[in-house]
Amino acid sequence: VMFSLFEEQIKHENAAIEHLITSGVESYAESLSFFPELEDYETGPDEYLNLLRRATEAVDIPVIASLNGITNEGWIVTARLMEEAGASGIELNPYYIPANLYTDGREVEQRYLEVLKAVKAAVSIPVAIKLSPFFSATGNMARQFDEAGADALVLFNRFYQPDLDLEEMEVITDLKLSTPAEIRLPLLWIGVLHGRVNASLAATTGVHSPLELIKYLLAGADAVMTTSGMLLHGIGFLTTLVSGLRDWMETRQHDSLAQLRGSMSHANCLNPAAFERANYIKILENYKAEYK
């Protein structure tokens, strides 16, 4: 999966060049023929699409483009360009913070569904959507995305949150990489959704060793994604993950991924209550016991 192309990048670059070309045209109209048209520049998605084309030509594995947009038009036009550039699939990466106090949950959910439906109608390649972890009913939204045609659900979008600098008295917008402790929320919902939706389930966040990869697969993930691990350890981290998974499977005599995938999901584990509220009190009691 490639990094996301942002609709704002497209709009900003196009608007900036348009301004440079047309600003003050009334004062030198006769010289306009010396200036190139906006289309002559490689702006907006052009560099991304060129990289996408080169990637699909260079590797034998599927290359999935990722799109972060804010309007239906922005999603649709760019999604079509990605398909034409050779993408094997598209990941929709909605990043929407409903800061308006008058925007209710149904409106937010409907916006996500409309985007998915619009892109599905515009392209013929598979479309995945990255879910927010803040839906009031995650299972219900997963079902609606599934019924709307999503080919895969990516759990979850990791919204970047600001901090405050107490010395400079300003908002800090730095990037904090994930940690292994963050796998628990996506692990919960992948375990719950496994076998209950037709869409494939992709896990993301917190994969820093083969252990997290194995846990996601046991919960029911069809695919496991990692970014922080790659940034910290480089390309060789992929070999570490695959080797660790293979060693674990051989030790436990698993012959295939299909054999272990979902074997500890909500539907298949010996204690399904561990995924739900029934285990809540036990967790608190165990924690208290450790610190007596």
Enumerate the predicted regions with their spans.
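Conserved active-site loop/cleft motifs that coordinate metal ions or position small ligands
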Residues: 202, 225-226, 258-261
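Helical hairpin unit composed of two closely spaced alpha helices linked by a short loop
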Residues: 223-229, 233-234
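Alpha/beta enzyme core
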Residues: 2-30, 43-64, 68-203, 208-224, ...
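C-terminal extensions of enzymes
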Residues: 233-252, 258-292
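Short glycine/proline- and acidic residue-enriched helix-loop micro-motifs
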Residues: 30-39
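Short, small-residue alpha-helix embedded
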Residues: 193, 227-229, 242
